[in-house]
Regions:
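Conserved binding/recognition cores within well-folded domains
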Residues: 112-135
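Active-site residues of response regulator receiver
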Residues: 55
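Acidic, metal-coordinating helix/loop segments flanking the phosphotransfer/catalytic sites
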Residues: 17, 32-51
Length: 135
């Protein structure tokens, strides 16, 4: 599985990569972006990843601004230090919402949840007008 990591803090990025490699060594990191602008450009210039891990507070604004700029169907696992954005996250493409510091069991649970959804299920889930929360 190839993933995009949207994270502007080096330590948080490295921690996430370390955990991903421990939990699912077959994961390929397709890219790492640090800002809304960089993420939009990356998504317009590359094949869609299968899953995105996305911080909310980025160097040039909120990750939710990405959804105002491009249509995005890729499922997202939000990673943030703030719990106040959970409802907004599930109004977009979120399949999970992890609070920092992220732990191995958090990533394992998020990947298990992703694995239980096939592509059609994901598209159907993401097309719901107001998902109530995590599966």
């Amino acid at each position: 599985m190839n993933v995009l990591i949207v994270e502007d803090e080096t330590a948080a990025y490295e921690n996430l990569v370390d955990i991903l490699m421990e939990v699912a060594p077959d994961i390929q990191i397709a890219g790492n972006t640090e800002s809304v602008t960089q993420t939009v450009h990356w998504l317009q210039s590359n094949p869609a990843p299968e899953l995105i891990f996305m911080d909310i507070h980025l160097s040039d604004g909120s990750a939710f601004n990405i959804f105002d700029k491009i249509e995005l169907e890729t499922p997202i696992v939000f990673t943030t230090a703030y719990d106040r954005y959970a409802i907004e996250a599930f109004k977009v493409n979120s399949i999970d919402y992890l609070l920092k510091p992220i732990k191995v069991e958090d990533i394992r649970h998020a990947l298990d949840k992703y694995g239980k959804l096939n592509r059609q299920d994901i598209l159907q889930y993401l097309s719901q007008p107001n998902p109530a929360g995590p599966c």
